[in-house]
């Protein structure tokens, strides 16, 4: 799933963890099978088999259906999907999170601009479509419309560091599912105007997040944001920055969930 990078959650250096991924296939005590490689576990009896579901069910419907039918093929299932967690005794909660912000930029930056959005050109998932709809409806209220779908930037810090707020829209809306789209905002002291995980209050201070469900809800929100609102939220912004550091590396949660297998 993430052979193009060292870490599953983004282009960061490897964290201080007592393991590294080995893709050579020569070490087989514990083997982790991600979404699209689950079927490779069938017939294997030479290792502990771990299923790690990285994508949401909206993105990998076929893989989730297969796992529901074949969950017993694995010694452990790592997932954020609520149904699997409730149904499978060998399932463990493993949040996605992730981060595309360099560690030296994890701080509350001096904010000089109000609102940004970063969007690719993709329009497949519900949240991807919603990003473009929000931009179409509310472009006059957005200071910077960035990303490969609009104006490409060298790094996400360019679209977050200077901004009090940023529209952070997940690819889908699902309990326990949140990604770097949220984490990157929190790590830069930027208040996410957020569409995504309905249960986000279980993980972060909701005073530092402005959640919405439909583009029509945004008009009033965008009228009320600004320096005074941001200053009022600063204690929650700092709390969320500290909390977000727990979710930078998905591998940290993987390790906590499988360390007993070694």
Describe the predicted segments one by one.
Residues 1-53, 58-144, 149, 156-166, ...:
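Pol beta-like nucleotidyltransferase catalytic core
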């Amino acid at each position: 799933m993430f052979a193009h990078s060292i870490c599953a959650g983004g282009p960061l250096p490897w964290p201080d963890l007592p393991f590294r991924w080995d893709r050579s296939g020569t070490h087989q005590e514990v083997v982790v099978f991600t979404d699209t490689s689950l079927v490779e576990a069938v017939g294997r009896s030479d290792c502990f088999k771990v299923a790690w579901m990285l994508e949401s069910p909206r993105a990998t419907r076929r893989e989730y259906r297969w796992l529901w039918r074949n969950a017993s093929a694995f010694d452990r299932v790592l997932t954020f999907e609520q149904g699997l967690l409730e149904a499978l005794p060998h399932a463990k909660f493993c949040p996605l999170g992730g981060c595309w912000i360099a560690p030296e930029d994890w701080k509350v930056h001096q904010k000089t601009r109000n609102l940004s959005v970063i969007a690719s050109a993709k329009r497949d998932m519900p949240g991807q479509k919603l990003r473009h709809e929000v931009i179409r409806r509310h472009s006059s209220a957005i200071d910077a419309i960035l990303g490969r779908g609009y104006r490409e930037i060298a790094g996400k810090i360019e679209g977050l560091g200077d901004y009090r707020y940023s529209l952070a829209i997940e690819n889908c809306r699902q309990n326990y599912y949140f990604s770097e789209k949220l984490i990157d905002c929190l790590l830069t002291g930027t208040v996410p105007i957020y569409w995504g995980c309905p249960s986000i209050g279980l993980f972060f201070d909701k005073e530092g997040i402005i959640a919405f469900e439909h583009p029509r809800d945004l008009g009033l929100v965008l009228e009320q944001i600004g320096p005074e609102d941001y200053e009022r939220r600063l204690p929650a912004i700092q709390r969320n920055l500290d909390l977000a550091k727990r979710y930078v590396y998905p591998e940290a949660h993987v390790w906590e969930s499988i360390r007993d297998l070694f």
